[in-house]
Amino acid sequence: MIRLCIFDLDQTLVDTEDMKELREAGKNRTDAAYAGEVLAAFRSRARHLIDEMTLRMLLLTIPGLKLGVFTRSPRRYVDVVLAEAYASINWDIVIAYEDVQRYKPDGEGVHRSMIAVGMNDTDQLPYVLLVGDGDVDIKAAYNAGCRVALFKKGWPHSYQKTHWRSLSLLPDVVVGDQKEVQTCLQDPLPGLPYLERLLEAGMPATVKPRFDEIAKFFPGEKARHVVHAAGRYFTSCEALKYRREWHHLSQSIQNNKDAVIFPSEWIETIRSFIAFHYLILTSVLPFSGTGPELVITVIPARPDRPHRLAHLLAQLQASYGTNPRLNRLRLTFNPNVLGYRPGVQSQSHDHLKQEARFANVRDHLYVANPSEVQGKRFLVIDDVTTTGSTLLYAKKYLTDAGASSVDCFSLAQTVSDPLKYQ
C-alpha cells in the first residue's frame, strides 16, 4: 500500500491547459494583482480532473496516507489554485517552482517531499507514488526512484507525440480516472507490466495481462513498428540508481546475463504472451491439416559467444511437453532461423549509439535458410531491447524472405538516463 502520494498539478489535479501563459508569467511573483488574475481565470470554467471528494476518500480509506503536490508551476499560482480547488485538503507537502534547485525531470522534489513527511530512507521508495500526466513526471519518478502512475484523464482523444512518448516510457501504472488512482494507491502491483508483476508480487495478472506495445522506428523513417515488452530494464546509470536498487526485473536480467537455465517466471511470461497474443489463432478451427503453425525463434548470439537464448528457447519448448501446441496452434521452435556474420559488434559493450546500432545489425544479421521461411508465421524473442534495431531487422529480413507475419517480443525494454535528453 502507498504511504505517500505526490500529485502533479496542471493536467493532473486540475485542467488548466488554457492558463499556460498566465502560469508561466507568475515565476517569482507574489503580488495580489497576479493572484487575482489566476483566481478569475481558474473560476471561469470547471477545472477538476481529480475532485476534492476523491482526495478526502483517499485519506479516509487509506490509513496514514500522506498527500503532496510536486509541480513546476510558480508558488503564488499554486497556492491560489490549491486554495480554490481543494479548500478542505491539508496537504502534507507542496513543492513549487521556487522550492527546488533542480526541476522535473529531476526527482529532487520527490526526495524533499519524502523528508517532509518523515520518510528519510531510500528503502521507503517503493511506498511512494508520483501521479502525473506526462513524460517529465515519469522521468522525475524514475530519477527519484519511486513508483509512477501516468494519469490520462486530461488527455485529448487523439494522442500527440508527447502522449505516445509518455506511454513509451512504460510507467508502473497507467490510469484513466480518479477511481483508478484510488485502486492503484491501495495496491500498485496489479497494473505492472506482466513479468514485473510476476517477479514482485509472485502471481500473474488476474485480468488482462499487460504487454506494452512500444513503437520503434528505423532511422529517418516514419513507419511505426511494434515491439511487445513484458517489463523494464533500468540501466546502471547514476540517474537511475535508486529505482534500480529495488527493481526485481532489472536484477533478474543482470543475474541471468550469462545463464543457460532461466527463471521460471521468464518462461511463464513468454507462454502467457503467446496465449494472449495469438488467442484467435488458438481457437479457430483449421480448414484442413493439423492447425496453424507458429515458428518461435530468438535473436542469435554473436559468432564468438554462446547462444544463451537458444537455451531459453529450449526451456520454453520443454514447458509445452512432447507435443508443443496451444489448442489448435502448432508451436515449432528453431533457435537457428537467424544468424550473425563475423565482425558484428556488441551493441552494449561497444557503447554503440542509435544509428551505429542499426547499421551494425543491418550489415551483419541474416536469415540462415530463406527457403524455409516462405509463408510461415514467426515470433522473434529477445531478452532486452533498447533501440529495437535487432528485432526490427529480424522482422524486415524474415518478411523479405517471404514470412507471412512476424511479431517481435522482448522480456524487457531498456530505460535509459531520464536526465540525459531534456
Annotated model-derived regions:
Residues 75-129, 135:
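Substrate-recognition "cap/lid" segment bordering the active-site pocket of phosphatases
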Residues 163-165, 170, 176-229, 392-422:
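PRPP-dependent phosphoribosyltransferase catalytic core
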Residues 199-291, 311, 338-370, 416:
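Active-site-facing substrate-recognition patch
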Residues 89-105, 297-301, 327-344:
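A short, structured active-site edge motif that brings together acidic residues
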Residues 139, 143-148, 155, 340-422:
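PRPP/pyrophosphate-binding module of the type I phosphoribosyltransferase fold
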Residues 130-173:
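Acidic, Mg2+-coordinating phosphoryl-transfer loop and its flanking beta/alpha structural elements
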Residues 33, 39-69, 75-79, 107, ...:
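Short, acidic loop-to-helix structural element flanking the phosphoryl-transfer center
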Residues 1-59:
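Active-site neighborhood of HAD-like aspartate-dependent phosphohydrolases
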